[in-house]
Swiss-Prot record:
Binding site for Zn(2+): C45, C243, H268
Gene: mshC
Protein name per Swiss-Prot or TrEMBL: L-cysteine:1D-myo-inositol 2-amino-2-deoxy-alpha-D-glucopyranoside ligase
Organism: Clavibacter michiganensis subsp. michiganensis (strain NCPPB 382)
EC annotation from Swiss-Prot or TrEMBL: 6.3.1.13
Names of required cofactors: Zn(2+)
Amino acid sequence: MRAWPRPVVPAVAGEPPVPTLFDTSAGSVRPAECTGDGRVGLYVCGITPYDATHIGHASTYLAFDTLQRVWLDRGYDVAYVQNVTDVDDPLLERATATGVDWRDLAAEQVELFRTDMEALRILPPDSYVGVTEVVDEVAAAVAELVRRGTAYPVATPDAAQPGARDLYFDVARAGADGPWALGDESGYDRDTMAALSAERGGDPERPGKRDPLDPLLWRAERADEPAWDSAVGRGRPGWHIECAVIALRKLDRPVTVQGGGSDLIFPHHEMSAGHAAALTGEDFACVYAHSGMVAYQGEKMSKSLGNLVLVSRLRAAGVDPRAIRLALLAQHYRADWEWTDALLAESVARLAAWDAWAADAASTDADAGEPGELVQLVRERLADDLDTPGAILLLDLRVATGVPATPVEVAAVDALLGVALGSPAA
């Protein structure tokens, strides 16, 4: 699947510190690397394309864009993979409700997502993979789990073909056989897991499962649903196995960082890690990093609630995407926070001040190759669990002095924060 154009990231001289991230599985901050050889891999779960990109989505993708920029500044070789869940129940339900073909709806929303990401100057993935592009590979992985005894069938009376059965992942068997055990990634207790499973696409009450928390690997074909012929019969993939297979196909093992919103900690990231470990006998990732939830009008912003602030609508209203980006960067990526008009207005004013600060950079006498104290301090803030609010505060304080920026400082704001000063975005 095609991604979106990559913005130019300036190179800035100097010796950036080793970046760190909060690892959900460890409950602490740790280096955002695995091997120390300068090669890093990032997998971030992508959209289910049934509605437009809202500020909550943008906040998550910007968090991991910032991680990439910090890695690149450090000189690392970065491989970034993102999926698109372009066949799933919410997409099919929206397509049915609106009377459009699910494939057309997915294509339309993916294109809008690309446009929003390009406008926000989010670095694109090196591999942008739709689930429909890897159905055969997912089915082969499910077949392998069946062969190993970590997958099993469950009676499916409503299957389109008599005798066809859904396939589930046996969490107890996987935990006994490999490096992963249920709860390793999330740290949640079983009661919390059961509640979240029911809330987030699981089916803990389904009869015939060995454990209520066992997740779906393969959904047998139902009437009027898309299905593919495969090694495990006609049907379509379950949610968690899709990401495990795509990551294992596209990235070195273990993945350096598995990223996404905090609402993916369980069941999605927990189970993806379990599937990958069952297939490889190895831990899936070194760091599990999660962004906080964004609220609007007092509730978590979500498609199901409809309380959305859409990036495309802000852009259509004339808001500079750089101001949107600064509004998001002003929040720590792990924090839960609420979007307000006042927050956006503050960022519009900040952008104007920064643009003015940068306007005379070309006329300064400072050596463009020497980053200086400000750039090093910004690097230190970003290396400390992506402390973008701290980095912004440092820049605000410098701007307030009235001393013009140096060319290297302007380049560093672009390279590290993705804000091209003096260059209004479309």
